Amino acid sequence: MADTVEEPQLQNGAAPAESETEQNPIPEPQLQTEPKLTGEIPEIEADLTPEEVQSEVTDAKPEEVQSEVKPEEVKTVVTDAKPEEAQSEVKPEEVQSVVTDTKPDLTDVDLSPGGSEEIPIRSTEVEQESTTSVLKKDDDGNKTFTMRELLSELKSEEGDGTPHSSASPFSRESASQPAENNPAMDLINRIQVNDEEGRSRQRVLAFAARKYASAIERNPDDHDALYNWALILQESADNVSPDSVSPSKDDLLEEACKKYDEATRLCPTLYDAYYNWAIAISDRAKIRGRTKEAEELWEQAADNYEKAVQLNWNSSQALNNWGLVLQELSQIVPAREKEKVVRTAISKFRAAIRLQFDFHRAIYNLGTVLYGLAEDTLRTGGSGNGKDMPPGELYSQSAIYIAAAHSLKPSYSVYSSALRLVRSMLPLPHLKVGYLTAPPVGNSLAPHSDWKRTEFELNHERLLQVLKPEPREMGRNLSGKAETMSTNVERKTVKVNITEIVSVTPCADLTLPPGAGLCIDTIHGPVFLVADSWESLDGWLDAIRLVYTIYARGKSDVLAGIITG
């Protein structure tokens, strides 16, 4: 699997809090775009709008599948996204029927790839306050303006004629207009909006564009002004109707991409620019459908998310959006390359979750991509290398993530719809059932020969070892024949209560038997177990952490309702 981000441990019973910001950037990432087979998990459309970052204008889209994220709310989640939790629209797609005896019919929900939204960083919404007001001066005393200041200046200009304060950063420049031959300004000036609210919003954007154009004329190396101007163009693209020709949405996005390119050349460490640039490219790719040109754009978007993550490895939103872009790309690349791209997407979603355990959008997106992989494996029979998980196990894993996302956000209709589709794939009345190798209870230093591979069950309350009764010879009957019978002699079993967990981590230790080591640290001490493979370990790590996170968020009753009916 692709490179992942180091995962934090649960500390003192608390998981990292999730960012509730929503995205409003450009692209509307959706779950995997093509619904296939019996049932598809609903896509989550995301509104992405620039959010306020550094210069205060930054935000992006995707998953819940769409959420607003600003520069610190970055566009992320469901490949196509705009603001997420509060603004994300979830539109389940029609599901195609699947012909298979191994899985239930899925007809109500769209689990196709792309069901999440990308989270934007930019934010130019009128009611949005800038949180990072960065006003940088160049040598001539020019400033890069924040959205809040621009709005304040606009109100002053359109008000009752009250003169501007001498302290206003715009008082000396309001009359200044950029050159008429500026192609970006020409595009913005030609935008026609039908409704009054849209016209008012566009006036603000045009006003801001003039300010940034003037700032760049005075100082062409002002990367903050270039970045903010790109956000204005990206936001203006959202204000253009889909059938508009002059200017088109794509024209504005293309111009925004040019500004991001210039800004990042001047300042290669501008994380927010790479993040929002990737969102703009994703929107351009969506416009082109499943074409070679779209494939190239998706690859460019993935490259920019990679650069964003390199600059800010702690960005779960960028990782989530990166996974969504790869999910979209997997629908276009040649069949021989698809599995590799899908598995890389899985690694990005998993890395996002391990940075933020309650990031329900990434959790849901991981469920949908696993569902799609199960469909492909069922249809093609897998790669034939003998290491692939069987479709049934992939479906079960998919259901675990979707159930967890629903438990964290039970009010999201898209999660509810998807859960109805996959709930029967869970090993009810448990969330997960599988095999782990465990030492004798209370003796983790026992010889490897004493460790036994046994079944474990995980529900909303505990992880429990299941020991089956062993038959043993009791003697001979009256006819002289040996007679055996089962005995239910009580034996100690490994049991870990969710409420007692401190951390859950992988471990590699020579004292453990061969396999993928797992350490569950509890208030009573560590519990060591060994999974059959590292891929199997990923499933156990995520499942236990998610159950703990659901408990820490006070949602255990929701999970209990799912698995107990």
UniProtKB/Swiss-Prot annotation:
Residues 1-184 are annotated as: Disordered. GO terms for cellular component: early endosome; membrane; plastid; trans-Golgi network. Residues 165-176 have a biased composition (Low complexity). It holds the Pfam family TOM20_plant. The modification Phosphoserine is found at S479. TPR repeats lie at residues 189-222, 237-270, 282-315, 326-359, 361-391, 392-425. The keyword Cytoplasm applies. Coiled coil: none annotated. Residues 42-54 have a biased composition (Acidic residues). Keywords: Cytoplasm, Endosome, Golgi apparatus, Membrane, Phosphoprotein, Repeat, TPR repeat. Gene3D superfamilies: Tetratricopeptide repeat domain. Disruption phenotype: Hypersensitivity to latrunculin B1 (LatB) and cytochalasin, reduced primary root length and root hair growth defects. The C-terminal domain (496-565) is responsible for the localization to the trans-Golgi network/early endosome. Interacts with BIG5. Component of the endomembrane trafficking machinery that is involved in protein recycling to the plasma membrane. Forms a complex with BIG5/MIN7/BEN1 and actin to modulate the function of the trans-Golgi network /early endosome at the intersection of the exocytic and endocytic pathways. May be linking post-Golgi traffic with the actin cytoskeleton. This is Protein HLB1. The gene is HLB1.
